[in-house]
Each structure stands twice: as structure tokens, then as C-alpha cells.
Design a protein with these regions (language model features):
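Terminal targeting signals and extreme-terminal segments of soluble enzymes
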Residues: 1-141
Length: 141
């Protein structure tokens, strides 16, 4: 499979994924893996000093999707979320910096299954775990 380079992926992400920067998600690549971080700010809160679950779900969807992109999307293809689930295990609090990482579980011809975790390294706690299914497709103009 001819996977696109990280530079090619970054160009596509900048054109198609405008929501992550809106939330303040920062993306970096280490050892050919996507790592995403988010510092919990006041606009992320859903309860006093606690990050809203929707913010965590958005970060998880991004972690799962970009992990799929980096590992399994051939040149000329895109991927979209078919479904995903999330288990909330601990709270992320105002001021916490949380980190999201993903791994591929299954790679088929048109579907990819990815697992992810979001954790707070400073507090040594797992915030949530997720799993998603992604559809590979060619762009139709």
C-alpha cells in the first residue's frame, strides 16, 4: 500500500480539518505516529473546572482518525468515521494538558479499526479510551 507522506497529510488536514485548531488541539509527529495535545481552558468546561465530555469525544475522534490517516490511508483516498465509542474513566480538569495517541487494531480493504487513549501525563491518569471504525474512500468532486 502506498501511504502518503506526512507532508502530504498535513496539507490535506489543513484544508479539511478546521475544527481541531478551533478547539486548540496541537498535533505533532513522533516516530511516525501522531500525538495530539490539548490544554484544558475555560471554554472547554462543562461543569465547574471539569472538561466537557464533548471536547474529549472530539479529541478522541481526531486521535482515532489521524492515526488511521497516518497508518492506513493510501494516496488518493480519504477516511471518515463510521462509528466510535468512548469510555470516560477520569475527569480532565481546568489547566490539565491531556495527550491523545492511537494504534491500528485492524486494517481491511475498506474499513480500518483504531484504538485510542487520552491521558494526563502530569497526573499519571488515564482520562478515556476509545475505539473507532473508519471508511476508506476516494474523493468525489
Amino acid at each position: 500500500m502506498n501511504i502518503m507522506s506526512l507532508e502530504e497529510l498535513e496539507k490535506i488536514i489543513k484544508k479539511t480539518n478546521l475544527f481541531d485548531p478551533y478547539l486548540g488541539i496541537i498535533r505533532e509527529v513522533k516516530d511516525n505516529k501522531i500525538i495530539q495535545t490539548l490544554k484544558i481552558a475555560e471554554n472547554h468546561l462543562g461543569a465547574p473546572n471539569t472538561c466537557h465530555g464533548g471536547v474529549l469525544a472530539s479529541l478522541m475522534d481526531s486521535v482515532l482518525g489521524l492515526t488511521t490517516w497516518v497508518d492506513s490511508v493510501p494516496k488518493g483516498f480519504y477516511c471518515s468515521t463510521v462509528e466510535f465509542k468512548i469510555n470516560y474513566l477520569n475527569r480532565a480538569m481546568l489547566g490539565d494538558t491531556i495527550i491523545g495517541k492511537g494504534t491500528i487494531v485492524h486494517r481491511g480493504s475498506s474499513l480500518v479499526i483504531t484504538e485510542g487513549v487520552i491521558y494526563c501525563e502530569e497526573k499519571n491518569i488515564l482520562i478515556c479510551k476509545g475505539m473507532g471504525t473508519f471508511n476508506l474512500y476516494t474523493k468525489k468532486d
